[in-house]
Amino acid sequence: MALSVQDCARLTGQSVPAMERFSPLRNIWNRVREYARAATTAAGITWLSRYVYHYHRLMLEDLAPGTPATLRWPLYREPPPHFLVGYQYLVRTCNDYVFESRAYSRLRYTEITQPGMQVVNWSVMANCTYTINTGSYHRFVDLDDFQNTLTQIQQAVLAERVVADLALLQPLRGFGSTRMADRGELEIPVESLMQDYYKDLRRCQNEAWGMADRLRIQQAGPKDVTLLATIRRLKTAYFNFLISSITSSAASLRIPHATVLSLPCDCDWLEAFLEKFSDPVQLDSLNEAWQSLPMQQMIRCTVSALSLPQGPHLLPPLSGSGMQGGVFELRPRENGRAVTETMRRRRGEMIQRFIDRLPVRRRRRRQPVPAPVSPEGPAVEEEEFMEIEETPAAFEQEVRETVAEAIRLLQEELTFAARNSQFFNFAVDFYEAMDRLEALGDINEMTLRRWVMYFFVCEHIATTLNYLFQRLRNYAVFARHVELNIAQVVMRARNTVGDVVYSRVWNENGLNAFSQLMRRISNDLAATVERAGHGELQDEEIDQFMSEIAYQDNSGDVQEILRQAAVNDADIDSVELSFRFRVRGPVVFSQRRHIQDLNRRVVAYASQLRAQHQPLPELHADVPLPPLQANPHPPLPPDARPQRTM
């Protein structure tokens, strides 16, 4: 694919005038003779990159003509003969994040030669790492009377997590940068400081909950914030509706008639639904509700709400007689038609009107499906059909499907960056794991400690993979020219003295590697929670466990996985997360004759020094460049292919 000057400038960090001076060319077919032989082959460019131009460092400089980086060897006031398109952008992406160490290795060059095309590509492996402190979660897990207060601790942990997942309606905005007293005039990125703060579970405690969603919303634009907040309100309202449906069957009888909504009293019941139920989930009220409900039922309500718009997941059985949901009371018929059937027929129009009222400009306006015209007097067949009594579950299911459809349409209005939510669905896996543990009666100190720790780890992995996805795959200019070949996440758990307790590796190939990694890691860690406290796996259990975590070949040592399942998580003080990925991008050649001639002289001089077994000059060394010798073909660099004569 041809590269424009503007695209080259964006992905190399150079100015447009500098790239215009460079005059990039991607395909050198039929123009090879314009260049020094070493500058056109993968082997020759490898030699130039490693020993002469040092491209791994030079590509990060300002290489406009006459800048300090170009004054001396080997550029002599001109840009280099090649640019690695996307390399500087990749390094800048990694530098802009909270990684503690970054390494770039295996910078290699490959060439593709076929009729009509001769191009060279570069590839590099990036390895970015940071450590999160996952030691004692003092607030809950390390209480001295843990066994005596297990239920209360479990409720507290889950309640705070639910509040973080459902009640984050007004995220902090406008971080930008600021100045601090001890930093002089240096601008401090506050958002990065807060991410650093979240690296320590012992320090941030319950504030760690919801970190991934907070950062996601903070990075969204004004329109996306409105839409994401509305989606969160719908999920919160549905969760509160489920809790109300379960807990208020008796209390609803005492509700004054004026506060009872008869649905569907009009076509826009969703507005009334949000008005009554979308108050943020409060920690105190949630703890009170938890006292009167079975733990498993509360977890299922949470999963059902968080999994929207997918599902239905674990729709909890609702108690009470009659179709009631807290302050909602349903009339048994409307024009002879069942209430749920009426809601279903009006669903599309009602959702469209709801979205149209939001203070955002819509991408496209859908034509609502016209509602079928029904006569005032129902037909005999309809009367016979409606004799079948409508169940409360049908109404609850219709409410969920309506909320789910509204969320789906709102997600379509999001920008692509904000719509991409596959990195933030890991919570459902963990709640479902807790639901299974609760059903088995297997909640103990070990499982709860691991659940908290792995949830915290997943928050970080999701945030980082989403950042890399947005910068490397969702940025159209980079994705158009640079390929993601492989991505890998390495998780190393260490004890208090720094020894590795276990190490896990997940690999994925292809353009969707980041999102595929998140799905695998979420499922893997959630399934491993259920093994906490059970010691080493028996031989007959290993195959089943490997199936549960969806183990794939070349994804780490099986013994490390078994060690992770059996370890006592109290021994783990920190977790090191390494994000490795290999990308491949295009090399562009200069069409400027003066740059080509300079390169030919540099190649000749470097080849002469090598032939004489003399060291090559250091980058930016003050070395006079000798004129080109009469022989136009200097000694070949290592492995350079002889030029064909026509």
From Swiss-Prot:
Preterminal protein is used to replicate viral genome, upon genomic encapsidation it is processed first into iTP and finally into TP by adenovirus protease. The record marks F175, G176, G326, V327 as: Cleavage. Keywords: Covalent protein-DNA linkage, DNA replication, DNA-binding, Host nucleus, Phosphoprotein, Viral DNA replication. It comes from the Viruses. GO terms for molecular function: double-stranded DNA binding; single-stranded DNA binding. InterPro entries: Adeno_preterminal. Residues 619-646 are annotated as: Disordered. It is found in: Host nucleus matrix. GO terms for biological process: DNA replication; viral DNA strand displacement replication. The modification O-(5'-phospho-DNA)-serine is found at S555. The keyword DNA-binding applies. Pfam families: Adeno_terminal. One of its GO terms (cellular component) is host cell nuclear matrix. Residues 624-640 have a biased composition (Pro residues). The record marks S555 as: Priming of strand displacement replication by covalently linking the first nucleotide of the new DNA chain. A motif (Nuclear localization signal) lies at residues 357-366. Belongs to the adenoviridae terminal protein family. Protein covalently bound to the viral DNA that acts as a primer for viral genomic replication by DNA strand displacement. Assembles on the viral origin of replication in an initiation complex with viral polymerase, DBP, host NFIA and host POU2F1/OCT1. The terminal protein stimulates the template activity over 20 fold compared to protein-free templates. Neo-synthesized viral genomes are linked to two preterminal proteins, one for each 5' end. Heterodimer with the polymerase; this heterodimer binds to bp 9 to 18 of the genome. Interacts with host POU2F1; POU2F1 binds to the auxiliary sequences in the inverted terminal repeats and tethers the pTP-POL heterodimer to the origin DNA thereby participating in the assembly of the pre-initiation complex (POL-TP-DBP-NFIA-POU2F1). HAMAP family: ADV_TERM. This is Preterminal protein. It comes from Human adenovirus F serotype 40 (HAdV-40). The lineage of its organism: Viruses, Varidnaviria, Bamfordvirae, Preplasmiviricota, Tectiliviricetes. The gene is PTP.
